[in-house]
Amino acid sequence: MDRDQKKKELEQTKNEMRRKLEEYKERNRIMASKTTPTATTTSTLNTASTPSPPVAQEDFNSIMNSIDSMVPTQATPSSSSTISTSTHAESQKSNYIRPTLTIQSLVIEHDFPPKEIPMYSKGTQTMTDADTSNTNNTPELEAPNKNKTKYQLLQQQQQQQQQQQSSLNQDMQNLSIGTDSINGDGSSTSVANSANIDDDDKDEIEIPELDENEKKDILESDSFKSFFGRSSRVIERALCLDDSIDILVDYTISDENSKGTSKELKLLATLSDERWTKHRSITDISWSTKHPELVVSSYSANEAGSHDPDGVALVWSVNNYFQKPEYVFTCQSPVMTTFFSKFHSTLIVGGTYSGQIVIWDTRAEAKPVQKTPLSSVGHTHPVYSMAVVGSANANSLVSISTDAKLCSWNLENLSQPIETIELNSSNTNSANKAGGGGSGGGAPNMSIAVTSLVFPENELNHFYIGTEEGVICQAGRHGNRIVMNERYKGHFGPITSVDLHPSKGGADFSQYFLSSSTDWTCKLWSSKKETPLYSFEDYVDYVYDARWSPVHPSIFSTGDGSGTLSLWDLNQDLEAPIFRHKISNRSVNRLAWSHDGKRILVGDSGGSLSLFDSSEFSSPTSEEYSQFEDVMTKMVNKSRTSDSPLLGEGENQE
């Protein structure tokens, strides 16, 4: 009976376990259909290493409780019931049906989609119109898809500004309400009572009343009378004149600085360096022929004293004029002239006050890579002017100095000059021509102190020189002698610059040239006439430089000791410049036009380079060339009949 009872209980337990397992499986299927699977879970009934879901944990506990409540598979012998014989035990063991319970690991399978691999392309980075319409429903700011992020930021900024403005208005309103709520006895009313005040009834700012004496003083003041007179005239014009007439025209504006033209030079920037240009004067300016944005400028010694070298040459980029110099070159003597080599774009040539000629290389350090010896072989006086002549395959450097020497150099070897010619009356076959005037005057062996040198285009032997005596000479090299072909007399002070006309645009104006001097004048010359064609005398100080525009036939610029830049147009006016600009209180030492004529650099004695935009004067018309040709023809004809051939006063008196 006991055994049958145990069998029944075991069968009931097995059925109960099957039923609970079926319920457990059904419950898991329902949960799998309702939730999204995230990971594969394997639960083992006899292993507790992996945590199970909460619902599954409850089922496992119930199963384990059922197993614990089961009858043990093998009865434990008791002290009260002891089997006496082994045969009886073996028969009982053989007849005993041992129940078995197999529990397998419960495996839950989940299906996960494959991981999406991002592909970066224009399609994935650009939203469609449909996406934009779904994500951006705000009508205040509709932006292109490409700039969606930018416009969203702008939208956020607008919203923040609106919130700040609204909060500020609210604070101001609360402040005004709080102020109005204070009574005269110092007690304050509630904000609720003051909120009923209408906005139109807010207190206005009180304007102080003036007494009769104050009103009388204002009405009789000069400033009020001037203001009232101008205002009344404007009102009368508005009431009486036609609408097409400018009623605000000002008849007090002077046109002295822009006479005859509405064009002007525009200041772009000022190039200077605290260390290298302060207390130094600019001695020369030159634009690069290869890199149109580069310019080199030379400087004198530091007047305030410095541990830096006396000679400085700086290379600037006008495209980066807010930056420091591109290159800084130094030498032991002040640099009086400098320029980029015409056929070697990386070489910069400089002439010094000691007479040395130095060459810097932009590929090397700040010190010169070559220099001439300090001896009588080269120059012993300051070198104020030099030029590179020849072609790309055969060229030489020609230098001239106040020591009356003209030297030719090979740029690859400056140890000694190729040729040296003495400029004195005994070595020039026309020294006594035109007698006197500062170039010897018939005195034997008198040296010619040269301050400027210029070669015509494509010329190797013929050149123009300006002297300290105020005479301009057209000379030529013939062997070891200098032939003075012409002498141009008209200045009463040292020549500071000579500049030949560039002769572009199809017309030949190469015979005309400009000169400036310390006699406060700038003169226009023709190489075919020994006296000036015209003398420009609208100056109050030394004229240090005069330069033709490289593209416009009738325009040139001058700089004087008063710190003024003057722009002249011979087609418009011969008596006054069309534009005049005060650079500084320091003298204007050097000028340099860019090769395209769209910019001009002005250097002063304070060490500053002023960059001007001259593009308005860089596009001449064919009519302006014809007009300039007519002007010069009339000037030449009148100078021939002038009563005073020395100064050309016949033209100046017109």
Swiss-Prot record:
Query: According to its UniProt record, where is this protein located?
Result: Cytoplasm, Cytoskeleton
SMART domains, alphabetized: WD40
Give the GO biological process terms: centrosome duplication; centrosome separation; Golgi localization; microtubule cytoskeleton organization; minus-end-directed vesicle transport along microtubule; transport along microtubule
Query: Looking at the record's lineage, which domain of life comes first?
Result: Eukaryota
Compositional bias, Basic and acidic residues, is annotated for 1-29
Q: Which family does it belong to?
A: Belongs to the dynein intermediate chain family.
Name of the protein in its database record: Cytoplasmic dynein 1 intermediate chain
Q: State the organism of origin.
A: Dictyostelium discoideum
Gene, per the UniProt record: dicA
